[in-house]
Every structure is written in structure tokens, then in C-alpha cells.
From Swiss-Prot:
One of its GO terms (biological process) is regulation of gene expression. This is Ribonuclease 3. Keywords: Cytoplasm, Endonuclease, Hydrolase, Magnesium, Metal-binding, mRNA processing, Nuclease, RNA-binding, rRNA processing, rRNA-binding, tRNA processing. Residues 169-238 form the DRBM domain.
Length: 245
């Protein structure tokens, strides 16, 4: 598996130059360059709290979820609520958002402080994912939902229409698999919680009686539990890396 792409330390790139680059890559003409700059600024930069991307990320996450849910609702009229939820989660998770950040080339435009180099691969992936969501919020505030929808469709539409069957929720899958191994249940435990309050990282361990435990990380307890469940499903051969079960 490829290691997460490192982020550069903060560098001086003019707001106009940044906007020009992103206008070409997003198809959107940015009206508020100060807000765009904020969307690209990590909290490690020594600046007032409102000068980083965190508030924009909050809004962009909601706009992305709504727009992708709408795309899936229209594209899969026969899909159940459960299948739509699985597809939605796969399309808005950190891995997908970070991959789109790489397509856009955002890593070279994100402003970070020197301490960003101490973050592990998972946290760096999360930074790139966060900036994509902040960028969505910037587009939304510039041009409304239609402008945000246009950008999201540009990068998410093809992914949303992939014909492969949606993979089931990892915790549900592990629960059923564990039951088949002798009527046992997975047990999840939080091993640690690190990072600031606004950007925590949870380390969770899952155990199934008779099997070695597995660990997973995530920005919430739920995501970390899913990550741990996925790790065990892959290790035990229940899931394959090609997406088959």
C-alpha cells in the first residue's frame, strides 16, 4: 500500500495564483479569496482560530453528504436504505476525500506549520480529506448548492456509479462472521485518545473469542471501530482486497 503523501510546510503562494490553479481544477471561479485561503490553512499555522479551515470543513462535510446522497438516490432507485448508506459512507469517507484531494493536487497548496511533520500517515490523510470538505464549503458559499453540486459531480459522479456491489458495513459483517464462529460477539475497547479536542484520534481494539485482536484508528469512536472491524475481516479472509467477500 502506498504511504500517505507528505504535506509541505507553509509556503508563500499568492492568493491569486492559488485561485487560478484551483479554478482550472475545480471549474469554479472563486469570489472570496480570503475564504479560499482559510480553506487551505491547517490549524498548525500560528493564526487566529477562525483563520483555519475547521469551520468550513464542518459545513462542507454536510454539503458533500447531502449531494452524494442525492446522487445515489437518483442512480439506484431499487437500492435499499441499507445499501444506499453503505455506498454513501464509502464515497464520503476520509480515504475517498483524500484521493480526490490528490487528483486536484491540493497537497501542494495546503498551508501547514512545521509540526505537521510529526503526524502519522492516517492524520495526514485526514488533513487532505478535511481540506476537500473545506473547499466544498467555499464553493457553496460562493455560488450556492448548484455550484457545489457541479464540483462534487465532477469528482464523485463516476465513483458513485461504479457497478461493483456495495460492501456491507464492517461492524455488521464482523458481527455475523463472529456469530458463525461459535455464537460469539466482537468486543470493542478504546485503547487511547490523542490529539486536540477539535481533531481527536481514537485507537480501538476489537476482540473475538478464539482469535487474535485487531486495532483501528479514526477521528471518532465509530470510525475507529469500523477500521478495526475491517482489519479483522481482511486478516481472516472474510474480505478480499479486491472488494470481494
Amino acid at each position: 500500500m502506498n504511504r500517505t503523501r507528505p504535506l509541505p510546510e507553509i509556503k508563500m503562494v499568492s492568493a491569486n495564483k492559488t485561485a487560478s490553479i484551483l479554478e482550472e481544477r475545480t471549474g469554479h471561479r472563486f469570489l472570496n479569496l480570503k475564504r479560499l485561503e482559510r480553506a487551505l490553512t491547517h490549524s498548525s499555522v500560528q493564526a487566529p482560530a477562525r483563520a483555519n479551515y475547521e469551520r468550513l470543513e464542518f459545513l462542507g462535510d454536510r454539503v458533500l453528504g447531502l449531494t452524494v446522497a442525492e446522487m445515489l438516490f437518483e442512480a439506484f432507485p431499487e437500492a435499499s436504505e441499507g445499501e444506499l448508506s453503505v455506498r454513501l459512507n464509502a464515497l464520503v469517507n476520509a480515504e475517498t476525500c483524500a484521493a480526490i484531494a490528490d487528483e486536484i493536487g491540493l497537497a501542494d497548496l495546503i498551508h501547514t506549520g512545521s509540526d505537521i511533520k510529526s503526524l502519522n500517515d492516517k492524520r495526514l490523510l485526514n488533513v487532505r480529506a478535511d481540506v476537500v470538505e473545506a473547499l466544498i464549503a467555499t464553493i457553496y458559499l460562493d455560488g450556492g448548492l448548484e455550484a457545489a453540486r457541479s464540483f462534487i459531480q465532477r469528482y464523485w459522479k463516476k465513483r458513485s456509479l461504479e457497478t461493483g456491489a456495495a460492501r456491507r458495513d464492517a461492524k455488521t459483517e464482523l458481527q455475523e462472521w463472529a456469530h458463525q464462529q461459535g455464537n460469539v460477539h466482537p468486543v470493542y475497547a478504546i485503547l487511547s485518545r490523542s490529539g486536540p479536542d477539535h481533531d481527536p484520534l481514537f485507537l480501538v481494539e476489537v476482540t473475538v473469542k478464539g482469535f487474535a485482536p485487531e486495532k483501528g484508528e479514526g477521528r471518532s469512536k465509530r470510525i475507529a471501530e469500523q477500521s478495526a472491524a475491517e482489519a479483522m475481516l481482511y486478516r481472516e479472509g472474510v474480505w478480499k482486497r479486491d472488494g470481494s467477500a
